[in-house]
């Protein structure tokens, strides 16, 4: 477990703080949300990444209504703080982010300070499987493209539920593999091989299915569980990624700021694009509320 955590920490220490993908995503370390069939553009990529956050909150019925919106939020796997900064600015919610990477925390603190949000946003170094917060601390618990790095996803979700206040919404955005057919016990060997290559290059532990997420949540104090397949909403990102990273600006940004780690990430993202086209890889949204 410690070895896996160290690999994830080094992965993000080596890529995100130095901005290997900054030219494409800005302060966000996740894909954007697009209308299906849209042609993604470099000029709109950062707005699409911010829209992903807004769509996640909308999916969880978070309203910009002072009487209904959460007072505070926890972002697990916060990266360089883009989600926390966006939510604090757009919704006025007090935000806390947590990540394994000390370098990401330093970068996130700098971004929050530059936005004048030191009083609204803060960041901790910590483990998602052992969150350093009391039970029922947060009115909203969110994670975007983080749980893929964790082997024990059920424990990750238990921790999300634990630190959520009664009735608080919980939101998970994650890559996942396709759901199995009723007669299948596992993915096909060639599918497993593809996913292993992707996971190895991105410091991911493994991928599960959206059905797995639902199964784990039904065993916990969670209600109003719902899922959505957003694969078509993220797929426009991949052609843009391939186009822009092979420009001089894109390639030098990857090579100079991210080095070999970022190049491996690019290769994995190319495999992800094909796996999504083949129906093997999905981008899923899951939300629920902690039972009162």
Curated annotation (Swiss-Prot):
GO biological process, one term: alkaloid metabolic process
Keywords of the record: Alkaloid metabolism, Membrane, Methyltransferase, S-adenosyl-L-methionine, Transferase, Vacuole
This protein's pathway: Alkaloid biosynthesis; ajmaline biosynthesis
Coiled-coil stretches: none
Practical applications: The strictosidine aglycone-producing AJM7-DeltaHYS yeast strain expressing pathway genes of the VOM module, RsGS, SBE (GsSBE, RsSBE1 or RsSBE2), RsPNAE, RsVS and RsVH, accumulates vomilenine. Additionnal expression of pathway genes of the AJM module, RsVR, RsDHVR, AAE (RsAAE1 or RsAAE2) and RsNNMT, leads to the production of ajmaline. Ajmaline is an anti-arrhythmic alkaloid commercially used as an efficient drug for the treatment of arrhythmic heart disorder.
Annotated GO CC locations: cytoplasm
Reaction(s) the record says it catalyses: norajmaline + S-adenosyl-L-methionine = ajmaline + S-adenosyl-L-homocysteine + H(+); 4-methylnorajmaline + S-adenosyl-L-methionine = 4-methylajmaline + S-adenosyl-L-homocysteine + H(+)
Temperature dependence: Optimum temperature is 30 degrees Celsius.
EC number, as in UniProt: 2.1.1.392
Pfam families given in the database record: Methyltransf_11 (PF08241)
Entries under CDD domains matching the protein: AdoMet_MTases
Subunit: Homodimer.
Reported function: N-methyltransferase involved in the biosynthesis of ajmaline-type monoterpenoid indole alkaloids (MIAs) natural products, important plant-derived pharmaceuticals used in the therapy of heart disorders. Catalyzes the indole N-methylation of norajmaline to produce ajmaline. Also able, with a lower efficiency, to mediates the conversion of 4-methylnorajmaline to 4-methylajmaline.
Family: Belongs to the class I-like SAM-binding methyltransferase superfamily. gTMT family.
The protein's name in its UniProt record: Norajmaline N-methyltransferase
